[in-house]
Amino acid sequence: MGSKSTRKLWAVHLAKGSKVTGKKEPTTMTLGKAFRGRVLGIDPSLRGSGFAVLDYAADGTARILEAATLKLHPKLSMPECLGAIGNQVDDFLNQHSVDHVAVEQTIYVQNFQTAQILGAARGAAIGSAAMRGLPVFEYAPLRVKQAVVGMGRASKEQVARTVQNITGTNFELRFDESDAAAVALCHAFTWRDTSV
């Protein structure tokens, strides 16, 4: 079967009585309903995970309800650390009526063992949320920084300052906490409910 050129296809189309008008049919694009509610942001790490519960109101204001850094002793075994991460997520979910969970994706690492450890820490956090049937969303660090600060290569200090300015937080956040809050803000700013 030979292929027809665009010119021949148009000739056949016009020969059948179709008209070409300069007007295009208007198209509508639906972005979906913006996120409103509470999101638990997680910056996972085996020894120092950050957590932040963010309330994103209908008027677009965001405030941090609670933030914490889970620092674990180097002598704890990996399974003990993973259990502690899962328990911390459970504690946040028990204390706050969370609608969504947002987790920072693992950045590219060259060391295979480091990648495995980070993946396990993420799995412990995601597993706790998934066991409750909560929707879990993952965001790359560059996307988080772009959505919150406006620059994909922003420093931790810039992220922390921007998070404090956006949320009106009057207490100092550790970097792990501000990173977790930034993941939650990224989700609140960018997620759309396309089911409506």
Named regions from a protein language model:
Residues M1-V196:
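Phosphate- and other anionic-substrate recognition elements at nucleic-acid/protein interfaces
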